[in-house]
Every structure is written in structure tokens, then in C-alpha cells.
UniProtKB/Swiss-Prot annotation:
Keywords: Amino-acid biosynthesis, Histidine biosynthesis, Hydrolase, Methionine biosynthesis, Multifunctional enzyme, NADP, One-carbon metabolism, Oxidoreductase, Purine biosynthesis. Its EC number is 1.5.1.5, 3.5.4.9. One of its GO terms (molecular function) is methenyltetrahydrofolate cyclohydrolase activity. Pfam families: THF_DHG_CYH, THF_DHG_CYH_C. This is Bifunctional protein FolD. It comes from Pelodictyon phaeoclathratiforme (strain DSM 5477 / BU-1). Homodimer. It catalyses: (6R)-5,10-methylene-5,6,7,8-tetrahydrofolate + NADP(+) = (6R)-5,10-methenyltetrahydrofolate + NADPH; (6R)-5,10-methenyltetrahydrofolate + H2O = (6R)-10-formyltetrahydrofolate + H(+). It comes from the Bacteria. InterPro entries: Aminoacid_DH-like_N_sf, NAD(P)-bd_dom_sf, THF_DH/CycHdrlase, THF_DH/CycHdrlase_cat_dom, THF_DH/CycHdrlase_CS, THF_DH/CycHdrlase_NAD-bd_dom. Belongs to the tetrahydrofolate dehydrogenase/cyclohydrolase family. GO terms for cellular component: cytosol. The lineage of its organism: Bacteria, Pseudomonadati, Chlorobiota, Chlorobiia, Chlorobiales. Pathway: One-carbon metabolism; tetrahydrofolate interconversion.
Length: 295
């Protein structure tokens, strides 16, 4: 079975992005800038933001983190976003989720200029994705990362049956729409399964490409997978494990050990889809920089 190594691909991609950033710096004297806003003290969010900032700096981009208190008002957050929208040195704006309950996440998403929405969450970017205008939008980073993996591993997708398990706005919905497009690593027949789907194995057993993004540890078992299928595991779930120093370990939505005896190729957890998400965020930021500067 082939292991689809997101850690390696993300490293290759980051090296490519660094070379591009260095080239644009020598030509224009400018570099891409990403600003991340974090509201509150959520530990997981703080880790994610630190990782994004660290990777950003490693490839030569300007990274700015704006920290706001838990009691920040929606009005203040949106005013800050509007200032960033008008700042020519900022090419990507990301508001780390989740947000405190007094803030409407959708209102915040709408406040971000679509041309700087490098997370790909703005309805304008999602609409352009659905219509196939991928050269004029930003694709949500996790689906975009999966597309990159499929392409770099030369996974045959044209005319294949892709089943996406999960319908979140961040992964499931954009992933399904992406796999419908007429691209080298897409052009599939697509089925979406979700919490109200009856007899999910009936659909997953038909999948040539199975993408699991349901948020349940080990949900996809070997008897749900068609022999020879390509399995992409988006899930990141923390489960107790007394044998580890931390007392827990990370697993995906797929029972990796069992499914690896059936699948032809799989992404591991950790080290599969996860590392690609930040890499694609930076790729989107570079694309924004190029568009804004007509490069």
C-alpha cells in the first residue's frame, strides 16, 4: 500500500514557495504579508497560530499576529478587519476560529475582503469555486491541500467515484465541489454522506476515492472500503493513551491499521492532510500577493 506523505509534500511545497518569495523580493522589493487575528485564550488555537506564524517566517513572508481579549466585541473585530482590508502590506487575513459566543463568525467572514480571504471561507470565493472560476478565487486550505496531494502522487481521478463523508463548510462542501471541477486531479463523480445518511457503508464501498472528514475517531473501518480504493483521512482526533508521555495520541477518522490492508493508498494521521493545510494557506497568500501586485 502507498503512503501518501503530506509531511514530505508540504516540505517540498514550502521550499518552492520560499524560492518564489525570494524571487519576488529581488524583483519588487516586496514580500507577501499574512495577518492572523486570534480572539481569546483557546490553547489549541494558540498552537495553530504559532505554527502558522513560524512557517510564514520560514519561507520569508511577513507574519503578524493580532491578539484580542475574550470579551472583544464583534464591532471592534470587524473594524480591525476593515483596516487590514485597506492595508497594502497585508495580502492575507485569517481570523482563527472558534470565536467567543458574542461574535457572529459569519459576519466576521463577510467583513474580510474576498481578495485577502486566504482561508477561502468568504461566500464570494465559495461561489467562484462552485462555478469553476478557480483562477479568480481562494480554495479552502484543507481541500486545496488534498487536491495537491492527489496531483503530486498522480492519483487517477478522472471519471472516478469520489465519496466525501462529512458536509462541513470548511472541508466537506468545498471538497465535494472541488472534486467536480474539470481539473487534472479532479473531474470525479461525487457523492456526499453525512450524519443523516442511511447506510453509509453502501456508499463508501462504491468509492474509488474516499475522503473522510466526519470528526469521529476510527469511523471508517475496513469493511466500509472498496478493495484498491484511495483513502484520504482528514480527521484529527485526540484519544487517551496511557502509554504515551502526553497521555494521548492523535488518530484520524479512519481505522488506519485495518483499512491499510484493503486500500491501495492512504494518508496517515498525523503526517497526512494536516501539514498540507498550512502550506496551502501560504500558497494562497502568495497568490493574493501576485494578484494585488499584478505579477
Amino acid at each position: 500500500m502507498l503512503i501518501i506523505d503530506g509531511k514530505k509534500v508540504s516540505l517540498d511545497l514550502k521550499n518552492e514557495l520560499k524560492a518564489s518569495v525570494d524571487n519576488f523580493r529581488s524583483i519588487t522589493g516586496k514580500v507577501p504579508g499574512l495577518t492572523v487575528i486570534i480572539v481569546g485564550q483557546d490553547p489549541a488555537s494558540q498552537v495553530y497560530v504559532r505554527n502558522k506564524a513560524k512557517t510564514c517566517k520560514e519561507i520569508g513572508m511577513i507574519s503578524t499576529v493580532i491578539e484580542m481579549a475574550d470579551d472583544t466585541t464583534e464591532k471592534h473585530l470587524i473594524e480591525t478587519i476593515h483596516k487590514l482590508n485597506n492595508d497594502p502590506t497585508v495580502h492575507g487575513i485569517l481570523v482563527q476560529q472558534p470565536l467567543p459566543k458574542q461574535i457572529d463568525e459569519f459576519a466576521v467572514t463577510l467583513a474580510i475582503d474576498p481578495s485577502k480571504d486566504v482561508d477561502g471561507f468568504h461566500p464570494e470565493n465559495l461561489g467562484r469555486l462552485v462555478m469553476g472560476h478557480l483562477d479568480k478565487c481562494f480554495v479552502s486550505c484543507t481541500p486545496y491541500g488534498i487536491l495537491e496531494l492527489l496531483g503530486r502522487y498522480n492519483i487517477e481521478t478522472r471519471g472516478k467515484h469520489c465519496v466525501v463523508v462529512g458536509r462541513s463548510n470548511i472541508v466537506g462542501k468545498p471538497m465535494a465541489n472541488l472534486m467536480l471541477q474539470k481539473l487534472d486531479a479532479t473531474n470525479c463523480t461525487v457523492t456526499i454522506c453525512h450524519s443523516a445518511t442511511k447506510n453509509i457503508p453502501f456508499y463508501t464501498l462504491q468509492a474509488d476515492i474516499l475522503i473522510a472528514a466526519i470528526g469521529k475517531a476510527g469511523f471508517i473501518t475496513a469493511d466500509m472500503v472498496k478493495p484498491g480504493a484511495v483513502v484520504i483521512d482528514v480527521g484529527i482526533n485526540r484519544i487517551e493513551d496511557p502509554s504515551t508521555k502526553s497521555g494521548y495520541r492523535l488518530v484520524g477518522d479512519v481505522d488506519f491499521e485495518a483499512v491499510s490492508t484493503v486500500a491501495s493508498a492512504m494518508t496517515p494521521v498525523p503526517g497526512g492532510v494536516g501539514p498540507m493545510t498550512i502550506a496551502m494557506l501560504l500558497k494562497n497568500t502568495l497568490q493574493s500577493f501576485q494578484r494585488i501586485n499584478n505579477l
